């Protein structure tokens, strides 16, 4: 018999069987047979106990049923988990532990499993894609790692048990259950997007905590509400400072949002009932600001859950990639890229490799912007490819999570980009090569600081080879400026210098232009380097600068930056003073045969001539740049032209600015979309240099345009204008009210996009609001708050919740997510949203067949008196044959989409103004606010409802807003 008794001996014996590394527990192999006999007997009696006693949430496990198992793709893994759970006698182990240890592991694990399954089963009833076997296995296994901690690791159990849980799951081939079980820390909520199973487990674990000890010193397990549990944990956290408390409050807010989302679905979270308790959904038009914020949160969480469900399943992820490959519309491709950019950090290694292959293929895409976006994302994905073990590791443990690391992948893709397959045509080779610098920049910006040098080394190896063909040499030269020279030692820099010096002798204009551009950019940092100056002299001696004005200009700039004497001052003087040079540049830049590097240098020369005070035809230069922006085949030339044009804008007179703006606007209207899509990025900035009068005319022209093809690019333009609108007041001081009214006008134009009848325009509106406004840093937090206040309720009304295609769903998910990030950040910083809402409601009923400009002006006038106006559309008219109700409602939607505080009254709540019961219901819909009736004077004079005897809640008891109408008699 063991000296400490059988139970402690069996307890240690079982733990050592589960975790053989527990050498701090004495070996007890001699008890194998006794343990097997005892455990089988114990299992028999515990089974009988379960049959006779009612279910206990701190003792029993309600595992997934056969029906639930049949719906899961993880059926095999879950059955394997149940077998492992049984073979290891884990339940019996926890029951023995309850008898001999002060802590009660069983009560905690069973409690977490109970809450998790209680919630998960209800969510499934609401249509949320929760995998019940997956969450059941993860909840039952989430703390098994506590048995793996050695005696000397007891103090670190809260931090180390995640590793040992993951270890047990990996040993038993439970990868999906293990991934969720081992990542249930509240700090895992700092990841922006998690699967619903992970959220449920973290939520359940958060609520089941120690609630003290009984008189025998045994742990009492408590089931807390979310708020109570937060207070308990905050009191227990070690080394709590303000930063850590804020960090904890941030993750708690994520759980709170998730709980509120579940409550909105009718999920019972207080464990009193398994039946759903649906909460009636109010129409978005009737929500106050707090309810609107909650609605945004719930929609974003719902979309995230559904998208993460698709991305976390191998089969559905493959379907998404296949759909992305097969699309022919570049905007659809952009939507897929946006989803991958937002969610790729949650992909597993295999999914990342599949996505990277797709991105590589996209670098052959005919649209330059798609190639650039794919290259940026490829670099970012390589930088974040390695799975980092985020939890604390035991001493002397080194985890190898994948056979392939990011450095091996980087070498592979470097080779595929620089030396593509021989079957790739020349044009695609060049497109692919031009992407290299984007990949390098993105990789070095997103990787860890200490890893940057390691990523640069494989790239430098290509510069040691001097036998490249011309096109490969040009690609490497074009990429060289993206290598941070500060990372390199002298020998590595000399490799780059020698590479440029060697290829300068090639009689290829674009190679020589690339070399001189590189030297020009490097010159300020290396004026003291003898090797660099030697390279400069060697290159300038070889390059025939006299024959090409662009090269001569760069040679002049290099000598000036390096402090070298100018050899041919007359030639350089000619570059800056001869008007014929400008004419030649205008001609060369519009020729297809001119290398794109030369075009970029020419634009730089034109701008430098203007800045140096040389008399120049500025308007001619500006229109030339606008032409390049509209028609250049090379995307880099378009962007260079646009950037130069915006820099030139302050130097133009007001009439010249207006002329250029009109020219660019025509480009929006008459150009094919594949060309005009580049204009908004720069037109939106440029028009903010127009005089207020001309700017208002520009906005009005875009608003009144009937050209369908302009709709999407107009939205993009308005988005860019909003990004930079904060600078306008300093350029043209005007009354604050005028400035704000114009901002609202621009925001209203974007809202109109949500009401457009074309699906692609609606998607573009969502893209502009989500990606261009809320996701970017152009706007301050206060500006975003004002934007949210203007857009939010209308967005909820106009964005159709029935997403008819997967692509629309992806687009909406990204948009809602960007707004949700802002909401979370703002509430964390400011605690809550505060907006001043009108306290008076104007109820404006009518047939509105048609809805005229007169109706719209009346609604505006009432709104400006301090009302929120609700247009109540009659289902039909007794007096005339009206258009179908849905047609009239659609027209109303489009007509008032851009108007602040003018909404459509919910069609599912008809109000008969002659019925006091309906009018009572109307008052109750706006608690704390005064409801006014809006009517024409002829209606008040003739309508039967005004001839009835007054009674409580009749129309005569409502205050009115009456607009005068002339009768046929002229009164």
Region spans (language model):
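Active-site flanking loop/helix segments enriched in acidic
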Residues: 82-109, 144-156, 323
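Residue-level signature of the C-terminal ends
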Residues: 342-350, 380-388, 438-450, 462, ...
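Buried hydrophobic core positions in alpha-solenoid tandem helical repeats
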Residues: 319-321, 358-360, 400, 409-417, ...
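His-Asp-centered metal-binding catalytic motifs of divalent-metal-dependent phosphohydrolases/nucleases
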Residues: 112-116, 129-172, 178-188, 205
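Divalent metal-dependent phosphate-bond-processing catalytic cores, especially two-metal-ion Mg2+/Mn2+ enzymes
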Residues: 1-80, 102-130, 141, 186-322, ...
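Nucleotidyltransferase catalytic core that binds NTPs
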Residues: 715, 719, 725, 729-971
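Residue-level detector of extended alpha-helical repeat arrays and alpha-solenoid scaffolds
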Residues: 333, 371-372, 429, 433, ...
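Short inter-helical turns and helix N-cap capping residues of alpha-solenoid HEAT/ARM repeat scaffolds
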Residues: 328-329, 366-368, 406, 421-425, ...
């Amino acid at each position: 018999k063991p000296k400490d008794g059988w139970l402690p001996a069996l307890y240690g014996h079982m733990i050592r069987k589960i975790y053989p590394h527990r050498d701090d527990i004495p070996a007890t192999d001699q008890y194998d047979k006794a343990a097997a006999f005892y455990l089988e007997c114990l299992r028999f009696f515990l089974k009988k106990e379960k049959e006779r006693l009612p279910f206990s949430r701190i003792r029993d496990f309600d595992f997934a049923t056969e029906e639930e198992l049949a719906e899961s793709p993880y059926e095999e893994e879950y059955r394997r988990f149940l077998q492992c759970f049984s073979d290891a006698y884990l339940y019996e182990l926890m029951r023995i532990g309850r008898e001999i240890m002060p802590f009660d592991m069983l009560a905690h694990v069973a409690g977490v499993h109970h809450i998790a399954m209680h919630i998960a089963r209800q969510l499934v009833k609401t249509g949320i894609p929760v995998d019940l076997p997956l969450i059941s296995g993860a909840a039952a296994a989430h703390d098994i790692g506590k048995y793996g901690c050695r005696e000397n690791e007891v103090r670190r159990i809260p931090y180390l048990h995640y590793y040992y849980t993951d270890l047990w799951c990996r040993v038993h081939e439970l990868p999906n259950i293990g991934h969720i079980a081992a990542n249930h820390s509240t700090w895992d909520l700092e990841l922006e997007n998690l699967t619903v199973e992970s959220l449920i487990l973290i939520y359940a674990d958060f609520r089941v905590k120690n609630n003290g000890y009984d008189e025998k010193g045994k742990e009492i397990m408590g089931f807390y509400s979310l708020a109570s549990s937060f207070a308990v944990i905050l009191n227990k956290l070690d080394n709590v400072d303000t930063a850590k408390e804020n960090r904890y409050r941030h993750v708690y807010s994520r759980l709170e949002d998730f709980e509120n989302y579940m409550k909105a679905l009718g999920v019972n979270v207080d464990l009193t009932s398994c039946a759903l308790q649906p909460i009636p959904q109010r129409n978005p038009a009737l929500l106050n600001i707090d309810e609107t914020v909650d609605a945004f949160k719930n929609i974003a969480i719902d979309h995230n859950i559904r998208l993460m469900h698709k991305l976390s399943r191998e089969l559905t992820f493959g379907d998404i990639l296949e759909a992305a490959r097969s699309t022919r519309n570049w905007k659809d491709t952009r939507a897929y890229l946006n989803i991958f950019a937002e969610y790729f950090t949650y992909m597993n290694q295999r999914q990342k490799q599949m996505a990277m292959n797709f991105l590589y293929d996209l670098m052959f895409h005919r649209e330059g912007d798609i190639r650039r976006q794919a290259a940026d994302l490829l670099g970012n994905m390589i930088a974040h490819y390695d799975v980092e073990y985020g939890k604390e590791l035991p001493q002397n443990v080194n985890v190898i999570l994948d056979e392939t690391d990011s450095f091996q992948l980087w070498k592979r893709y470097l080779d595929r980009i620089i030396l593509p397959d021989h079957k790739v045509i020349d044009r695609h080779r060049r497109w692919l090569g031009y992407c290299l610098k984007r990949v390098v920049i993105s990789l070095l910006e997103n990787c860890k600081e200490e890893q940057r040098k390691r990523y640069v080394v494989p790239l430098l190896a290509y510069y040691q080879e001097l036998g490249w063909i011309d096109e490969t040499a040009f690609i490497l030269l074009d990429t060289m400026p993206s290598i941070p020279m500060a990372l390199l030692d002298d020998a590595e820099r000399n490799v780059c210098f020698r590479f440029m010096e060697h290829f300068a002798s090639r009689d290829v204009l674009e190679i020589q232009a690339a070399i001189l551009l590189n030297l020009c950019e490097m010159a300020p940092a290396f004026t003291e380097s003898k090797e660099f100056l030697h390279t400069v002299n060697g290159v300038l001696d070889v390059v025939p600068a006299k024959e090409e004005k662009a090269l001569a200009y760069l040679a002049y700039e290099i000598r000036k930056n390096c402090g070298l004497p100018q050899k041919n001052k007359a030639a350089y003087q000619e570059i800056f003073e001869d008007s014929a040079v400008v004419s030649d540049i205008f001609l060369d830049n519009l020729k297809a045969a001119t290398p794109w590097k030369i075009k970029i240098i020419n634009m730089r020369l034109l701008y430098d001539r203007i800045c140096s005070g040389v008399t120049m035809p500025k308007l001619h230069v500006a229109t030339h740049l606008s032409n390049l922006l509209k028609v250049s085949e090379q995307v880099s030339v378009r962007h260079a032209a646009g950037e130069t044009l915006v820099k030139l804008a302050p130097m133009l007179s007001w009439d010249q600015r207006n002329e250029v703006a009109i020219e660019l606007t025509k480009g929006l209207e008459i150009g094919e979309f594949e060309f005009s899509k580049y204009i908004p990025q720069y037109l939106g900035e440029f028009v903010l240099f127009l005089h207020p009068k001309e700017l208002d005319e520009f906005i009005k022209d875009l608003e009144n345009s009937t050209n369908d093809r302009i709709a999407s690019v107009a939205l993009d333009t308005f988005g860019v204008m909003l990004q930079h609108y904060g600078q306008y007041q300093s350029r043209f001081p005007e009354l604050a009210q005028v400035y704000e009214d114009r901002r609202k006008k621009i925001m209203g134009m974007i809202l109109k996009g949500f009401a457009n009848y074309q699906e692609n325009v609606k998607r573009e509106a969502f893209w502009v609001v989500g990606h261009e406004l809320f996701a970017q840093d152009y706007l301050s937090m206060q500006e975003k708050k004002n934007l949210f206040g203007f857009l939010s309720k209308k967005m909820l009304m106009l964005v159709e919740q029935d997403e008819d295609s997967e692509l629309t769903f992806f687009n909406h998910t990204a948009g809602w997510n960007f707004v949700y990030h802002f909401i979370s950040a703002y509430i964390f910083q400011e605690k809550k949203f505060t907006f001043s809402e009108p306290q008076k409601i104007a109820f404006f009923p009518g047939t509105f067949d048609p809805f005229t400009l007169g109706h719209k002006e009346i609604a505006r006038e009432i709104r400006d008196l301090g009302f929120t106006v609700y247009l109540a559309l009659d289902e039909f008219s007794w007096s005339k044959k009206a258009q179908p109700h849905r047609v009239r409602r659609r027209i109303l939607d489009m007509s008032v989409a851009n108007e602040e505080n003018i909404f459509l009254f919910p069609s599912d709540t008809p109000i008969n103004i002659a019925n006091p019961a309906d009018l009572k219901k109307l008052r109750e819909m706006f608690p704390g606010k005064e409801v006014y009736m809006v009517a024409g004077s002829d209606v008040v004079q003739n309508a039967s409802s005004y001839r009835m005897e007054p009674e409580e809640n009749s129309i005569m008891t409502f205050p009115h807003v009456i607009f005068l109408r002339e009768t046929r008699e002229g009164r």
